Amino acid sequence: MCCLSFASCGKQSVAVSPDEMASRAAKIYYDYLLHGDCAAYVDGFYRPDSIPESYREQLIVSAKQYVGQMKTDHQGLVSVEAAGARTDTAKHVGEAYLMLGFGDKTKEEIVVPLVLHNGNWMLR
């Protein structure tokens, strides 16, 4: 641990723009779908209040159905690429643009609405 703190002393931190952070967050959430982790995808949605576990399970089933529909329609999701984002940090909202690649070689650009909550970009 001591070595790590000394090694990082000489590095300068690189500021990352809110747009870049939102873009990265959206990609991570869709990467969860790509890798079949529907629970992590569902947990990426902003909810101001807690929800019952039974409702969370329904949302996970819905995400699995979405993944299944992509398999049926396009031979599955095979890649997720960040294509940019626009954010309004004063209003704590943004939208990220992702390019989804499918097994049938088609691509689709989607808009992912996001909300900034406690410093984290979350799905809206």
Language-model-detected regions and their locations in the chain:
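Sec-dependent bacterial lipoprotein signal peptides
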Residues: M1-C9
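Short amphipathic alpha-helical segments, especially helix-boundary/capping motifs
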Residues: C3-L4, V14-S17, A39, R86-T87
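Small side chains
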Residues: S5, A26, G94-A96
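Short, low-complexity N-terminal intrinsically disordered segments enriched in polar/charged residues
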Residues: C9-H35
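Short solvent-exposed beta->alpha transition segments
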Residues: S23-R24, I28, A39-T89
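Exposed beta-sheet edge and beta->alpha loop/turn motif
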Residues: E81-R124
